[in-house]
């Protein structure tokens, strides 16, 4: 038997049954059928359980009256605090726990929906490429803020069923604005805090070939969901530059727009941000111009 019952009213059959249930659930989480196989750490928070609970990692009883263990707020996994240090990065978020699309961790969102990229990115880019590639000042011209907020609320409310068609939003700048807002609202930027400094250092390399190689090496450090989303965005932005005659947007212009959107320094420093802006622009410009080589 895997545990000893803490109270007389719980017989050994009940205890064993609960333990087996925990182990089955743990196995299901470990061997989930997520085709894209993105790793995600659990988002554990101290939790007070009502009634008897067993750790879903070690299968032992969680003793105490308050704060007996921790629960993952994304998938609901319950474990001892000390066991949480050993749980693998196999969080499979439950859609019921994902309350919104914007401001949600990117990997959490794609794992919950079992998609390669956030649906916002796919849907907005499809709409922009269908009717906006020749629009002058694409991504540089801003749409009405309240309409952009409407699109955000539509995605948060309706998910992939959100209607952003020309019938509802004829101004394509509203859709580009909603896409940029999604990237700005990410708690961890597309180009993560962990890789930010390395990208900036790569941008400072004077030799073009060495700089490209350095950028490629740092790209490999991005989490898979971030890498895939960035790759898809750069392919799209390359298409935007191919219509420069009409939209007047080249890779440098897009770098100015997307640099601060995709890259944020780990420390919230105005001086750092101002100092790094030219390197942020350059990184995005390099990614666009060399997307076929870098990705």
Swiss-Prot record:
Zinc fingers typed Phorbol-ester/DAG-type, residue spans: 41-91
Cytoplasm found in the keyword field: no
Regulation: In the inactive state, the N terminus protrudes into the active site of the Rho-GAP domain, sterically blocking Rac binding. Phospholipid binding to the Phorbol-ester/DAG-type zinc-finger/C1 domain triggers the cooperative dissociation of these interactions, allowing the N-terminus to move out of the active site and thereby activating the enzyme.
UniProt topology in membrane: Peripheral membrane protein
This protein's UniProt keywords: GTPase activation, Membrane, Metal-binding, SH2 domain, Zinc, Zinc-finger
Residues covered by the Rho-GAP domain: 104-295
Top-level taxon: Eukaryota
SUPFAM superfamilies: Cysteine-rich domain, GTPase activation domain, GAP
Role, per record: GTPase-activating protein for p21-rac.
PANTHER family: BETA-CHIMAERIN, CHIMERIN FAMILY MEMBER
Name of the protein: Beta-chimaerin
């Amino acid at each position: 038997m895997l545990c000893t019952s803490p109270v007389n009213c719980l017989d050994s059959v009940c205890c064993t049954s609960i333990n087996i249930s925990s182990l089955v659930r743990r196995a299901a989480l470990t061997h989930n059928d997520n085709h894209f196989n993105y790793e995600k750490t659990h988002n554990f928070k101290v939790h007070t359980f009502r009634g008897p609970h067993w750790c879903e990692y070690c299968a032992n009883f969680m003793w105490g009256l308050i704060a007996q263990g921790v629960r993952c707020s994304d998938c609901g996994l319950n474990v001892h605090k000390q066991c949480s240090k050993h749980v693998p990065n196999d969080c499979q978020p439950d859609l019921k726990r994902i309350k919104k699309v914007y401001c949600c961790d990117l990997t959490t969102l794609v794992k919950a929906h079992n998609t390669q990229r956030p649906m916002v990115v796919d849907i907005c880019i499809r709409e922009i490429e269908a009717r906006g590639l020749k629009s002058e000042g694409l991504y540089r011209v801003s749409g009405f803020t309240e309409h952009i907020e409407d699109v955000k609320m539509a995605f948060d409310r309706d998910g992939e069923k959100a209607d952003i068609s020309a019938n509802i939003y004829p101004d394509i700048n509203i859709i580009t604005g909603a896409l940029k807002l999604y990237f700005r609202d990410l708690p961890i930027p597309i180009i993560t805090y962990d890789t930010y400094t390395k990208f900036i250092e790569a941008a400072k390399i004077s030799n073009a070939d060495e700089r490209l190689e350095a950028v490629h090496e740092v790209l490999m450090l991005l989490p898979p969901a971030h890498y895939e989303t960035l790759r898809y965005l750069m392919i799209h932005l390359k298409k935007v530059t191919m219509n420069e005659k009409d939209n007047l947007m080249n890779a440098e212009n897009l770098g100015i727009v997307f640099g601060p959107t995709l890259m944020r320094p780990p420390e919230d420093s105005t001086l750092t941000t101002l100092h790094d802006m030219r390197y942020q622009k350059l990184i995005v410009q390099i990614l666009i111009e060399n997307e076929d080589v870098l990705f």
